[in-house]
Amino acid sequence: MATISQIPFSISFPCFEFRKPSFYYHQPQLFVSYLNSTKKHSFICFACSTKQTRVRKRVKSNEELRSEIMQFVALAGLPEGHVPSMKELSAHGRVDLANIVRRRGYKFIKELVANSGMEEDCNELVADSEDNNTNIETGGSRACLEDSSTDLSKEAEKQGSLSKDESSLAGVLSLENSFSNLGDSNHSGEITEKIFKIESVELNEIADIENSSSEASVFANHSQDLYDTSSCPDIEAGNVSMTEDEEVNDVDKDFSLTFDHYTSPTSNHYTSPDLNSIKHVDIATGSSYDLTSENTMTNVENFQNQQIDDIAANRSGSADDSLVESEDNDWMSGLSSCTSSIEEKTTRFIQNGYLDTVGADENDIPNESCPEESSETTKGGEYIGDSLGGPRIMSTPLNGSALALKEIIHATEVNSSDRNSDQRDGSVGLDTDPHHETRKRENQVEIDRLRFMLDQKELELSRLKEQIEKEKLSLSVLQRQAETEIQKAQMLISEKEVELQEAEESLSGLQEVVIEYCGDGNAVEVTGSFNGWQHRVGMELQASKSIGKQKCWSTLLWLYPGTYEIKFIVDGQWITDPQKDSVTRGHISNNILKVDSQ
């Protein structure tokens, strides 16, 4: 029966730590307490109301500020790259942006907008490179998974699927265990079961190909280090005297690779090379070899051939140069021991039924004096000779991997010829090495000088660019000023044209009037109510009409139709012409001028 235990607890309010005055001085609105004396523990709950704290607005980051400014420039129709001023922002209703520009500074906003273009270009380049890398990795993993799943697709529906996180690693471990247990008839049922699991795993990987790129890379790493993983408990129980790590080192150091199988009702033999001696792994079995599935054998052979090709490629790329420096006297001194070793191995093959390999360090060479031993030794293997005349014996697996061994021979011969040619080229190039070093140093100095010149030119170009930008800015300011002045002049011209038109309309009713004065005097002027008695109009002397002391003066005026009062000024005295009509008001008398409309 489940019991419920009462655990004491307390509720703390973090906000009260920073607002102790309000906790002390504000009376709580609600106080609830529940005390039960009969129970061991009690529960107390406090509820208190405090003043709402002031929430400070979040400060906008540079990216947000830049995006808002770019949006404002686009919406306002301003040119791209233009930095809006506080006046422009306020005019368009963005007072918040105007305050931010005022606080952070116009120079900072300008640099922020200017750097946006460069960051966009860098982001595009980075995005393109990431897309290319993703496509390459996805394509490689997809091709690897498709190749490995074509041969295993027929039996995949019979088995359950593993989880996605463990599918690739489980497939690798199952494939390693089935490969290491290939010659064990006692574990044949386990190999078949593991192969079926691999088939279901491969189908799951194909179905989830987009989520398995990392798992495919794990598969590639484990396939290169196949023998580095720990073997299954069944193999450990079989008294395996050699670890997989030693097998990898032996294959990398030795020139030959041996996979020798011999099937018998009682035992299976697996032979692998070692740097110092040949080691045998005898696994006792209690059942016959019952791998009857053709697909299983085909998959194992394909995997075995692939591993042989990989090891041959690694071996051909990292061949030991010490074989080139071997001497004939060492080779001749080991002939006798090699012959006895071949005899012992031949006898062992006849008695026990399995064939040992001849290691590279023993330098076993078929002798003309022992043709029978040579033929018996090479009966179950391939004869391989290197560029130095040192033949090797490589056992051929009984499951049909002779083609892979031929590829190993071809790769080894090509590597030996390339190594010899490289050595000859190196011996020839020793004499010219100082010359090449001198040329290399001179080229490096020239490259450094060119780089320095390039940097100087780039600096000059950047300065010229800045100067051009400044000139463009000043020219744009002058252009705006000129446009403003032109607009003002155009407005003034339009106003004057209106005034001129009005003046023409007002002058359309003027009449031409000729005023004459005859009398004695030297200078005569006329004034009157037509100009407000303010301006005096000089009169010209008419010599044709003057007779003796009687002189005549005349002038031409443009006046509107009506009656005007005029007066003549003769030698500075205001007088009236007695020959014209006059009017008297009080003590003042003036001549009358009448203008009739036509």
From Swiss-Prot:
**Keyword Plastid attributed:** yes
Q: Which UniProt keywords apply?
A: Chloroplast, Coiled coil, Plastid, Transit peptide
Region described as Disordered: spans on this chain: 129-167, 359-392, 414-443
- Per the UniProt record, one Pfam family is AMPK1_CBM
Coiled-coil stretches are 440-516
Report the Gene3D superfamilies cross-referenced here.
Answer: Immunoglobulins
Q: Which GO CC terms are listed, alphabetically?
A: chloroplast
Ranges of Acidic residues composition bias in the record: 359-375
Q: Where is the transit peptide?
A: 1-47
Domain of life of the source: Eukaryota
Compositional bias of type Basic and acidic residues: which residue ranges?
152-167, 432-443
KO phenotype (gene knockout): No visible phenotype under normal growth conditions, but leaf chloroplasts exhibit reduced number of starch granules.
Instruction: Write down the InterPro entries for this protein, in alphabetical order.
Output: AMPK1_CBM, Ig-like_fold, Ig_E-set
Q: In its UniProt record, which GO terms are filed under biological process?
A: regulation of starch biosynthetic process; starch biosynthetic process
The subcellular location is:
Plastid, Chloroplast
The record ties this protein, via PANTHER family, to: PROTEIN PTST HOMOLOG 3, CHLOROPLASTIC
User: How does this chain assemble?
Assistant: Interacts with PTST2.
Domain observations: Contains a C-terminal (513-598) carbohydrate-binding domain (CBM).
What function does this protein fulfil? Involved in starch granule initiation in leaf chloroplasts.
**Name of the protein:** Protein PTST homolog 3, chloroplastic
